[in-house]
Regions:
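A ligand-binding cleft/hinge motif common to bilobed small-molecule-binding domains
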Residues: 25-29, 184-199
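C-terminal capping/gating helix-and-loop segments adjacent to ligand/active sites or protein-protein/ligand interfaces
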Residues: 243-309
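Paired acidic/hydrophobic, glycine-rich loop segments that form the ligand-binding mouth/hinge
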Residues: 14-21, 164, 181-186, 201-202
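Short beta-strand->loop
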Residues: 37-49, 73, 198-210, 221-222
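Extracytoplasmic ligand-binding site segments that recognize negatively charged/polar headgroups
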Residues: 23-170
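Periplasmic-binding protein-like
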Residues: 145-155, 196-220
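Early extracytoplasmic/lumenal segment of secretory-pathway proteins
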Residues: 1-32
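A bilobed periplasmic-binding-protein/Venus flytrap-type ligand-binding module shared by bacterial periplasmic
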Residues: 82-89, 124-125, 213-227, 246-250
C-alpha cells in the first residue's frame, strides 16, 4: 500500500502534516504504526455537526477510531457506490445488479478495474440473490473469493463486459459516449457523464452497495511541527455545511454534517431552484441506499488480502 510505504519506509512524516485515505482499515494501520496521532475533537468547533452514523456503536463509528477507540480521523465525504445506467437506452430505471450481468447488455457493461470494490460489489449481488453462500462480502474467505472471481471470469469469457474502467476520466467517457450503458462506478462519474448530455442515472440496488468514506488524519510529524491547531481549523471547513452542500451539488458525495438543507435555504443566491431540487433528490436517494440491508462497508485489509489480489 502506497500510503503505508510512504510513511513507514519513505519520507512521509517529513513531508506531510496530514493524510487522507479511506476509513475502514487504513486508520488502524496508520495508528498501529504510530504514523498518525489521536485527535482532540473539542478543538473542532464543527464536530458537533457530524452525522450520527459516526456515534459510538453506529455503522461508521469504527472508521474514524483506532483499535483503542481513540478518534484519529475526520470524515469529509462518503457514499454508497451503485450502478450508473443510460435510462433512455435501457428503457427505464434499474434497481438490481442483475442488469450488470444480464445478457441483454452483453458488451455494454463495465466495472471498475480494482479488485476491492469490484469483488465486494459482486459478492453483495451473489450473496443477496442467493447465487453464492457468502458470510461477509467485505471480508471473504479464500473459497468465497475464488467463487466470486470465477463468476466474473465466466462473464468476461462470455463477452459481458465492454471493459473494466481505469480512473475517473475513463469511467466518465465510457458512459458519456454511450459505449457503455450500465456500469458500477462512483457517483461523481455518473454526475459528470450526465452533464455531458447522456441520460445517465444513478440507481439504488435492492441487493446492496459497497459503502465507504474518506477521512483526514493528523500525522505524528505534523503535530511535532506545531500544525495541530491549523489541522483543526481546516477540519472545521470540511465539517461545514458550506463544504457539504457544494460537494453534494457538484459531485454527488454524501455530506458528513447536519445542516446542509438549512444552509442551502439560507443562501438562495448560491443555490437556485433547480440545484435545490437536485440536492433534495440526491439526499433522498442516499437515504434509500443506506437503508438497504445488504450494504457492506469497504474493507481495505480483509483477512485474505492476498486472495483478493
Amino acid at each position: 500500500d502506497q500510503a503505508i510505504q510512504k510513511f513507514f519506509v519513505g519520507d512521509g512524516q517529513k513531508l506531510y502534516d496530514a493524510i487522507t485515505d479511506n476509513g475502514g482499515g487504513q486508520e488502524d494501520a496508520m495508528s498501529d504504526n504510530k504514523a498518525i496521532v489521536p485527535l482532540d475533537v473539542s478543538k473542532i468547533k464543527n464536530w458537533k455537526n457530524l452525522i450520527s452514523e459516526y456515534n459510538e456503536g453506529n455503522v461508521a463509528a469504527n472508521t474514524i477510531r483506532n483499535r483503542k477507540g481513540e478518534i484519529v480521523g475526520v470524515p469529509y465525504i462518503s457514499n454508497a457506490d451503485s450502478m450508473a445506467y443510460n435510462k433512455s437506452k435501457v428503457g427505464g430505471d434499474i434497481d438490481t445488479w442483475d442488469a450488470l450481468f444480464d445478457s441483454q447488455f452483453k458488451g455494454y457493461a463495465a466495472m471498475q478495474n480494482d479488485s476491492g470494490p469490484t469483488l465486494t460489489t459482486t459478492a453483495v449481488y451473489l450473496k443477496e440473490s442467493g447465487k453464492q453462500d457468502i458470510v461477509n462480502p467485505s471480508d471473504m474467505s479464500k473459497s468465497e473469493v475464488k467463487g466470486v472471481c470465477q463468476f466474473l471470469i465466466d462473464m468476461k469469457k462470455k463477452g459481458q463486459f465492454r471493459t473494466f474502467w481505469d480512473g475517473f476520466g475513463n469511467g466518465v467517457d465510457l458512459l458519456a459516449s454511450e459505449e457503455v450503458l450500465v456500469s458500477s462506478c462512483w457517483e461523481p462519474i455518473a454526475v459528470i457523464a450526465a452533464k455531458k448530455g447522456a441520460d445517465i442515472h444513478y440507481g439504488t440496488m435492492k441487493e446492496g452497495h459497497q459503502t465507504w468514506n474518506n477521512v483526514w488524519m493528523l500525522t505524528k510529524g505534523g503535530k511535532q511541527r506545531g500544525q495541530e491547531d491549523n489541522f483543526y481549523k481546516l477540519m472545521d471547513l470540511y465539517l461545514s455545511p458550506w463544504f457539504g452542500a457544494r460537494t453534494l451539488a457538484n459531485l454527488g458525495f454524501t455530506p458528513q454534517m447536519t445542516g446542509v438543507n438549512e444552509y442551502v435555504d439560507a443562501n438562495p443566491s448560491d443555490f437556485d431552484a433547480n440545484t435545490k431540487a437536485v440536492i433534495a433528490q440526491r439526499l433522498k436517494n442516499k437515504s434509500d441506499r443506506m437503508a438497504v440491508k445488504g450494504n457492506s462497508w469497504q474493507n481495505l485489509y480483509p483477512k485474505e488480502l492476498r486472495a483478493y489480489q
